[in-house]
A protein has these predicted regions:
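Conserved N-terminal entry element of GNAT/NAT acetyltransferase domains
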Residues: 1-19, 137-163
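Intrinsically disordered, low-complexity, positively biased terminal segments
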Residues: 1-8, 18-19, 23, 56, ...
Length: 297
């Protein structure tokens, strides 16, 4: 069967996705060589808005894109995927233009792969930072066999989060992220395998979640007062799983990246953080260590 012409693809309707599209979304991820991640798709479709184009051959979805709105302050864009058999036929550009028109009024942010960056630049996005994805088996000792370097956390302790911590988490997150993520954070207890908070003399100074993605466990979001608190949260989360870890670390946090390398997490890939409608991301970058997932920020 021959592929539809670019002209016929341009006429395919763009529709809203819902939780009934979980399997087709996961199939599309698999088609592009990504983990299926139905668990993550479920969260993204409930907390955000999915856009899709049905494949003209009747086999699932030809393309997807997802937005997560944080009020008028920011909208995250992600999961721009096109089935391999429809690649390089203008679908991604058309879908992104529709999303940008629909989300008009709020600044946009996304994490771009090297493959996707030229499209985003053509559409007016500008690079504002980078993120380093690292992954691997967590080891409690360094490569020499001696205990890995650990920053002093003095009076900081971490523990599993409770429902009573949500408001303090939201306040800390608003400072770090610069936009209200309440609707996302409220879903973390059900979504995560583990949600951990850090305290210093009764004050909440950080939080992080651990959630499953295929054979790996992902750390994110990670918001912390400083690198020492971030490391304490990751260390205690790592102790709760036997899976390899994965985390997308904002590139400016070189000290944390060095500590993670010492614990066995190696570079996997890099993405470019890009924005549209704003010259920089809101919030306090010094406290923002890792996104929940690049698609949601």
């Amino acid at each position: 069967m021959h592929s539809p012409s670019p002209h016929s693809l341009a006429n395919l309707p763009i529709r809203r996705l819902n939780r009934g599209d979980l399997v087709p979304c996961a199939d599309l991820c698999e088609d592009r060589g990504w983990p299926r991640d139905e668990h993550r798709w479920g969260l993204m479709l409930s907390a955000g808005t999915g856009y899709g184009i049905d494949a003209p051959d009747g086999k699932g979805l030809a393309a997807t894109c997802l937005t997560t709105s944080y009020g008028t302050g920011l909208t995250a864009v992600g999961m721009l995927l096109v089935a391999g058999r429809y690649a390089r036929q203008g679908i991604a550009r058309r879908l992104m233009r529709q999303v940008m028109e629909t989300e008009k009024g709020a600044p946009l942010a996304l994490y771009a792969t090297d493959q996707g960056r030229p499209l985003y630049e053509d559409l007016g996005f500008s690079p504002v930072g980078r993120a380093e994805r690292v992954g691997g088996r967590w080891t409690p000792v360094g490569p020499s066999g001696s205990p890995s370097t650990a920053l002093s956390t003095s009076s900081v302790t971490t523990r599993p989060a409770s429902a009573d911590d949500l408001q303090a988490m939201i306040r800390l997150d608003l400072t770090a992220f610069g936009a209200d993520r309440t609707h996302l954070l409220a879903r973390l207890p059900a979504f995560s395998d583990r949600l951990q908070v850090a305290e210093d003399q009764g004050e909440l100074v950080g939080y992080a979640a651990l959630w499953p993605s295929g054979p790996t466990a992902v750390v994110g979001p990670l918001v912390a007062r400083d690198t020492a608190v971030a490391q304490a949260l990751i260390t205690d989360l790592a102790a709760t799983t036997d899976r390899p870890l994965r985390i997308d670390v904002e590139h400016r946090h070189k000290e944390l990246l060095g500590l993670l390398a010492d614990r066995g997490l190696k570079p996997v890939s890099r993405t470019t953080v890009m924005t549209y409608g704003t010259a920089e991301l809101p919030g306090d970058a010094a406290r923002r260590f890792a996104p929940l997932t690049p698609a949601t920020g």
